[in-house]
From Swiss-Prot:
Gene: rplT
Family matches, as Pfam families: Ribosomal_L20
Signal peptide boundaries: none
Job description of the protein: Binds directly to 23S ribosomal RNA and is necessary for the in vitro assembly process of the 50S ribosomal subunit. It is not involved in the protein synthesizing functions of that subunit.
Protein name per Swiss-Prot or TrEMBL: Large ribosomal subunit protein bL20
One GO cellular component term: ribosome
CDD domains on file: Ribosomal_L20
Stated family: Belongs to the bacterial ribosomal protein bL20 family.
Cystines in this chain: none
Gene3D superfamilies: 6.10.160.10, Ribosomal protein L20
Length: 119
């Protein structure tokens, strides 16, 4: 029985990795071993950062809400507590959007929170 060298399979495997590494800098898109390492790292970064993105956006929203709340004489935590007492259920994404794009609506919410806090 003849020995099978597997050249077609190996070439296909290498070609697939190098195709994934297209656009990488330097040897990372040319040499198979470095390309393979970089593709593996890229998958890791993509997985990690899909989770990190959620945290980053939440941080951004909280920062924006805090800045707008302080313009209305409240801290972020006081505003959130006041909204909870007033039974106003609006998420941080929507609050941040109001703070940036519709200051009058945000001020109305801040006033409702102030009223419930007794300020």
């Amino acid at each position: 029985m003849a020995r099978v060298k597997g050249g077609v399979v190996s070439r296909k495997r290498r070609k697939r990795i190098l195709k994934l590494a297209k656009g990488y800098y330097g040897a990372k898109h040319i040499l198979f071993r470095t390309a393979k390492e970089q593709v593996m790292n890229s998958y890791y970064y993509a997985y990690r950062d899909r989770r990190q993105k959620k945290r980053d956006f939440r941080k951004l929203w909280i920062t924006r809400i805090n800045a707008a709340a302080r313009l209305n004489g409240l801290s972020y935590s006081q505003l959130m507590h006041g909204l909870k007492l007033a039974e106003i259920e609006v998420n941080r994404k929507m609050l941040a959007d109001l703070a940036v794009n519709d200051a009058t609506a945000f001020t109305a919410l801040a006033d409702a929170a102030k009223a419930k806090l007794g300020k």
